[in-house]
């Protein structure tokens, strides 16, 4: 995709256009300074507002100016962290001008690609407010999709730890929890933006637009609830992993203690027979096959002790 594309819907069909015009959707993906200046001058927008969404630390907000409205929200994104796929959030800028809508983002995003690929039905770039709300709605559903993906990853970790717990599982679980923290923070900030949109009198809205905005609010709240639920579940999974590790350690210690007890019997008896003591004090010392008899007694005692320990489940690893 080009760094700056222009689209417009005609008869519900999205097509790429060559010139700016009424009903145009201008898509800016990681624009250069010169491209940002060109758009800022063309539509009389402050350059800082055009570049705002390119700052990862930019907070979500609504800014209404005389000839344009700037909306910045956080959208989910995938990045490589510690050689693993991780989820984070990045800003998406939406600028409403007189007859166009401009979207600005630091990278390509499935939130916008869904519209370009025709996955979203019945949207029109000419209906700016409704189109913006459809973008926000798609953003909420994308959050929910990634949340379900993270929950499936957590389920796989739970299945693995039933057999063997590895350091990688602990790291993966921590990564998932960090991702949920990012999502929760961004969704709450987006919720504030949506609440402001419902109250702004300077932004003209039609009744059907307000209904769609209500749907966006519902989906955003649902995403927040899903995030909290999954955080609680991951917290429980982490406690489960800690319990499993402790139980396995306790079982290993009990097994080693049981082996030590079993091995102590032949050690003590052989130690006694190894002392420099007269043979008359040593049972079976002068008896034919005395060594074999003593070994048999040691074996029987060891077996009896092992059976007792097994019944007490001390020989279970």
Residue ranges and their predicted role:
Residues 221-317:
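Hydrophobic alpha-helical transmembrane segments and their immediately adjacent juxtamembrane loops
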Residues 197-210, 236-246:
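Long amphipathic alpha-helical coiled-coil segments
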Residues 4-199, 205-206, 212-215, 219-226, ...:
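Peripheral, non-transmembrane regulatory/ligand-interaction domains of membrane transport proteins
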């Amino acid at each position: 995709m080009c760094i700056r594309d222009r689209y417009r819907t005609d008869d519900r069909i999205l097509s790429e256009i060559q010139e700016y015009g009424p009903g145009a959707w201008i898509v800016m993906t990681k624009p250069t300074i010169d491209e940002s200046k060109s758009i800022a001058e063309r539509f009389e927008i402050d350059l800082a507002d055009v570049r705002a969404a390119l700052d990862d630390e930019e907070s979500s907000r609504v800014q209404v100016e005389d000839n344009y409205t700037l909306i910045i929200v956080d959208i989910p994104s995938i990045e490589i962290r510690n050689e693993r796929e991780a989820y984070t959030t990045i800003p998406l800028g939406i600028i409403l001008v007189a007859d166009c809508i401009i979207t600005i983002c630091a990278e390509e995003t499935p939130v916008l690609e869904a519209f370009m690929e025709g996955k979203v039905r019945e949207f029109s770039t000419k209906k700016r407010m409704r189109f913006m709300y459809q973008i926000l709605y798609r953003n909420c559903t994308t959050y929910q999709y990634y949340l379900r993906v993270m929950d499936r990853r957590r389920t796989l970790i739970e299945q693995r730890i039933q057999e063997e717990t590895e350091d990688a599982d602990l790291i993966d679980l921590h990564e998932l929890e960090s991702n949920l923290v990012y999502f929760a923070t961004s969704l709450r900030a987006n919720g504030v933006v949506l609440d402001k949109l419902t109250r702004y009198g300077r932004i003209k809205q039609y009744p059907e637009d307000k209904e769609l905005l209500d749907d966006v609010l519902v989906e955003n709240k649902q995403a927040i609830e899903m995030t909290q639920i999954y955080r609680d579940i991951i917290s429980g999974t982490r406690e489960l992993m800690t319990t499993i590790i402790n139980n396995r350690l306790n079982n290993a210690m009990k097994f080693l203690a049981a082996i030590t007890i079993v091995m102590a019997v032949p050690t003590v008896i052989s130690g006694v027979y190894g002392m420099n003591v007269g043979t008359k004090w040593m049972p079976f010392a002068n008896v034919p096959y005395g060594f074999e008899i003593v070994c048999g007694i040691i074996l029987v005692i060891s077996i009896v002790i092992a059976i007792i320990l097994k019944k007490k489940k001390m020989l279970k690893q």
